[in-house]
Amino acid sequence: MCTARTAEEIFVETIAVKTRILNDRVLLEAARAIGDRLIAGYRAGARVFMCGNGGSAADAQHFAAELTGHLIFDRPPLGAEALHANSSHLTAVANDYDYDTVFARALEGSARPGDTLFAISTSGNSMSVLRAAKTARELGVTVVAMTGESGGQLAEFADFLINVPSRDTGRIQESHIVFIHAISEHVEHALFAPRQ
């Protein structure tokens, strides 16, 4: 029988996951390197794309908003697009082809070498996200995979991997948001912070 966890138990679990991340130099270095990659890309005129399904789609859209809007201080927008946000494209491609190709087809029409794709999937095995990552690699687009502990099949296509050390979907998604904020803040400060 499955019993509901208390709020206290969930907070203990989320703190434990964040502590594992804090002690994982590889993950923390990956976040810094991803931020540096975005900074270099933006300086060269590149764009950033994100994709995911369900809660990961919400994370993708949140990330795009941090880049096109702002996180810490007012500044010019940065090019970023959550690929699921165009509902007409999504429903047309899903209807006329299949759902697994919705993100890949959007990339084929918009992405170019030097751009970056954030492929977000807690399992690392979402077929639509996998196809997007494969297409991105074929197009010369850098792939950042954001997954759970195993990395799933998505790890095979990743230039950079953020694999949160957990198998709990909620804890993975919470950690993805922390990484999204950390990367966004790093990029924003590097590109727009006033020089002292």
Swiss-Prot record:
GO terms for molecular function: carbohydrate derivative binding; D-sedoheptulose 7-phosphate isomerase activity; zinc ion binding. Changing S123A: 4.4-fold decrease in catalytic efficiency. Pathway: Carbohydrate biosynthesis; D-glycero-D-manno-heptose 7-phosphate biosynthesis; D-glycero-alpha-D-manno-heptose 7-phosphate and D-glycero-beta-D-manno-heptose 7-phosphate from sedoheptulose 7-phosphate: step 1/1; Lipopolysaccharide biosynthesis; LPS oligosaccharide biosynthesis. Its EC number is 5.3.1.28. It comes from the Bacteria. Changing S121G: 3.1-fold decrease in catalytic efficiency. Changing T122A: 14.5-fold decrease in catalytic efficiency. It catalyses: 2 D-sedoheptulose 7-phosphate = D-glycero-alpha-D-manno-heptose 7-phosphate + D-glycero-beta-D-manno-heptose 7-phosphate. Zn(2+) binds at H62, E66, Q173, H181. InterPro entries: GmhA/DiaA, Phosphoheptose_Isoase, SIS_dom, SIS_dom_sf, SIS_GmhA/DiaA_subfam. It is found in: Cytoplasm. Gene3D superfamilies: Glucose-6-phosphate isomerase like protein, domain 1. Homotetramer. Interacts wit HddA and GmhB. HAMAP family: GmhA. Catalyzes the isomerization of sedoheptulose 7-phosphate in D-glycero-D-manno-heptose 7-phosphate. This is Phosphoheptose isomerase.
